[in-house]
Every structure is written in structure tokens, then in C-alpha cells.
Amino acid sequence: MIQHTNARQSSVAIAPLRQLVSDSPEQWGYWLGRKHYSLEVVQHPLRARMCGFGDKDRRPLAPAAVAKMVVRRDDNSIVDVDDMDCSFFLVTVDLWSEDGKHETNLVLHPSSVDRHIPPHSSTKSRRRGTSSSAPQSRAPANQTPSGGSTPTLSQHRPGEQRPPLPHPHASGYNNQGYVTPHAPQVNDALGFPPSTPYGPTQADSSWGYPPPPPGDRSTSFPHPTLPSIHTLGRSPSSSTSDHWNSEPEPQSLPYGAWNTDAPYHPSISSYSNSQVDPSVRNHSNSEGIENPGWSSSEATSPHSQADHAAYESSTYHHSAYHPAPTHSQMAPGTCSSQHVSTVPPPPRHTYTRTLVGPLSANACRLLDEHRKPGIFFLFQDLSVRTEGTFRLRMRLMNVGAPPAPEVGAARVHNDVSPVLAQTFTEQFTVYSAKRFPGVPDTTALSIALGNQGQKLPLASDGLSEALVEESSRVQQASETQWFRV
């Protein structure tokens, strides 16, 4: 059954055609030049079966939504179809609620809903949200017997002297050219982790270095094994490069000298005294051999400089870019990580389109079931993912370059296109697979448009097939008579 909407009276036909009833959705037209453009829904969808969240099972709305463009002059007369250029007219469609007040174009995809993690979950699930480093496992050992709480930043006053931290690999390494104040031994939980920044040391790896020999290295110091050129190329330090360039290059070196005009590491002086460990600060001060303030008593031998360069290429740049965490910095992180581990992560929602199918339609000059020409817009392949009651909002626009929408436009413009008209369909219901009552009968307008080459979904029952055949015979007879005249 063909249903017509927007039954206008002559007193309000020239006005912007807004609904007088506040409960109905907003429908209007637009004046452009001396012509008024409006949309009429000549066929409303009645029901559909929900298509779900897949892309293969399509359940189109039945019957298909069809809109018609109406153009009027100042005297309320309708412009003939042959006097209009419909090449650049199109209608867009989107999904709205049953009252036409809220859009429902997006729906939450069911696969994106994260499950709630209970606070008392297994140990394995709690470890995923916390740090897997060694200081966390030793955190209970730092608790005092009386309070039983981990020290925080507020417990360390700014003026309080903090014990300096030992430098990594400090055991077994003797500073040859300078004296570093001996740091008191502190707990392992307050210092560096037992592993090196680059993983376990291997003898055959270009990133590893052989362990230092036992005993006093100042008495018998062999020639150091220099790192690979790839390792030195990655090192940000260039403190001893000037001395190496002045010495004759040994034959065992597979590479030559490199340029050290521009430093590749930030100056250690940019860090404040409270951020840099004393051992690191003293270590960095000893590397500036270009500084004229150095005394001759602090100069080192070539062997100590080579060993110092091999040592600092593997450890110093890591401590310069990432200062050693102090006790006050690690304790709050340990407490917060244990507390955050019980809180579930925020859900990651993924939304998808509720209305599936082509959301725009081009204008087509067709004949309706009464053999009257018109400019129609067909939406024959629209599906809805979820069940409920909805409406379709349709908007008319013209995308042609001037003089569009008048006759003579030859191309599409690149500017913003104004909306010329807006209208809504009547309410339709989307059912689940079990509650779907069935596809409605094919309408006469669908048969008439299908006979003109438009692909519309038609019912497969015997009555609809008979109507299609009868309409086809009438269509052919009328076309033959029209051509003879």
C-alpha cells in the first residue's frame, strides 16, 4: 500500500514547511532563489528483521524507503520535471529514535565489552597490572617493625642527608685517575636491580664485555678488550675520543677514529644535585678532560682511559639519561602499583554503525504507479543491526557547481552544500529472528519502479508475482501507446 505524507494546505505551502505539532519530528523545506525545495516520503518502511553485527546476513527494510523531490515556484505551482536538472541532487539518510528527537546511528559492538575483573582475583591476573621487577618483591623487607608501612616522599625531609647509592658494577672496578668517596653499603632494594641494563653478559656478543679479573687491577693491568665499532657508534660519550685521536692506532683495531665535534649526550650539569646520585655526579665530573680546570695530577694513563671508555660506553649513558631511582622514588611506586593492581582497567568500547547499507541515493527520473513522472530517491538496501522502533531522517542537497541547482551545471563543486530539505519517515519496527512476523506484501510503487530497471526487494509469494506480471503488461502497453503518439 502506498502511503503519502506531508499533506500540505495552500496557506502554509510557500512557508518553510515546518510541522506545527511539537511532538512530531522536524520537517522543513528551503528557498533557494525563487524556488522552494521539499521532500515527500511516498513509501515508508514498515518492518525489518535485525541483521546482527555480521556483514553477510543482510535483512533490508520492507518495503523500501522511497522519497520524492517537490519543487515549487512563488505562486505555489509545481515545477515540471522536464524543467529541472536532477544530475547533482542526492538524499542522505540516517537512523533516529521513534520520536525523531535523538539519533541512533551508533551501537556498541558486543565483542568490545570487557569483562569486569573482581578485586580478589588470582595471583596470575594481579601480576599483569603490576611491575615484574625485582624491587617489588623485596618491598616488604623495607617495612619497619613498628609501622609496617613503606617510606614515602613525605618521610624524607629536603634537608636530610641521604646515603649515596653504589654505582652499578662498582665491585671489582678500581678508579685509576680519580678518587670517589666510598659509599656505605645499602640494601639491594634501594639500589639497582641485579641485572644489567642490556641483559646478561655474553662473551661472544658485541654488546657484552668480559668480567674483570680478580685481584688488584692496579698492579697488573692487561690491555683492555675494546668494544665493537657498532657499540661505540651508539655510545653517547665522547670524553676520551680526543686522547685516542692523538695516539697511534693499534693494529688490532678494526676501525679508525671518529668525529666528536658535537656531543651526543646531555650535560650532567643540567641535572640538579637532588636528582643525580653523588657517585654518578663524581663519575661525570671526571670525564670532562677538555675542561681547563683539570689538574695534571688527575690525568690517567692510556690503559686506564681505554678501560674507562669501554666501561662508560656500556653503563654511563644509561645512568645519564635515566638517573638511578632513590629510595623515596621507588617506595611510592611500589605502593601505588600494589594498589592499582586491584582496580580493573578502563573498558575499551568499539562502536559500529546501526544502519547498514548505502546511506545516500542519487536522483532518478521515474514514473510512479499512476504513470506520473517525478524525481525519486530509492533506499532499497538498508538494514538495521539491533531490534527496536526507529525512524529514517532524509536530507536533500545539491552538489553541483554553479549554476546548480539550475540547469547548466557541469561538475561537482568542492565547497559545502546546503541542506535544501529535511523529512522523516514514519515509525518502523525491527524484530529479532524469532519475533519477525514476515516480509510484507510488495507494493504497487515497488512493482512500478522495478519494471523501470530499479532493483527493489520483492516478495516471493504467488499474489505478489501475479501483481508483478500484471503491472509489467500494463507498463509495456502504456509505453507502446506513448511511443506511437
From Swiss-Prot:
Stretches assigned to the Velvet domain: 33-459
PROSITE patterns, A to Z: VELVET
Chief location bin: nucleus
Pfam family, one: Velvet
Induction: Expression is down-regulated during fruiting body formation.
Keywords: Cytoplasm, Nucleus, Sporulation, Transcription, Transcription regulation
Positions of transmembrane segments: none
Biased composition (Polar residues): 134-155, 234-243, 267-304, 326-341
UniProt cross-references to InterPro entries, sorted A to Z: Velvet, Velvet_dom, Velvet_dom_sf
Gene Ontology CC: cytoplasm; nucleus
Subunit structure: Component of the heterotrimeric velvet complex composed of laeA, veA and velB; VeA acting as a bridging protein between laeA and velB. Forms a heterodimeric complex with vosA; the formation of the velB-vosA complex is light-dependent.
PANTHER family on file: SPORE DEVELOPMENT REGULATOR VOSA, VELVET COMPLEX SUBUNIT B
Protein name: Velvet complex subunit B
Gene: velB
